[in-house]
Amino acid sequence: VLRRHARHVQTNEPIPDALIERLKRARRFGQAFETVRYTASALTDMAVHALPQGRVPADPVAFEAQVLRERGLPPGVGVNHRFTHFQHLFYGSSYAAGYYVYLWAEVLDADAFGAFTEAGSAFDATVAGKLLKHIYAAGDSVEP
């Protein structure tokens, strides 16, 4: 895609292969921090939903700090959402304790894209047809 569309604004030359290789090597830079941040938010989500019915932390900030300390969050990493504005916690029972679904979605995405990688092209028509038939069109009609 980059070779086709990324061009120099003045010369219209395509992006150099060396720059594409540098981008590929750097694409996962810092990913571990992002994974830890998502996991920290998911752990906080699970902790609040594991509380007995009707129990609300008296000090939400202290509750969050305790949960993250007990789970071993490395100092300086931070979280995606501070407990006091983490709206996913309060979207009703259909979203209760489910923030980890974003991590699961990344796993499924990587697995599906792996089929295109194995085929040698992100535009492989055969793989795209299987994705359409077995995932998109099937939707939730088949038991996992």
Regions found by a protein language model. Give the residues of each.
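C-terminal, non-catalytic "cap/extension" segments appended to globular domains
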Residues: 1-144
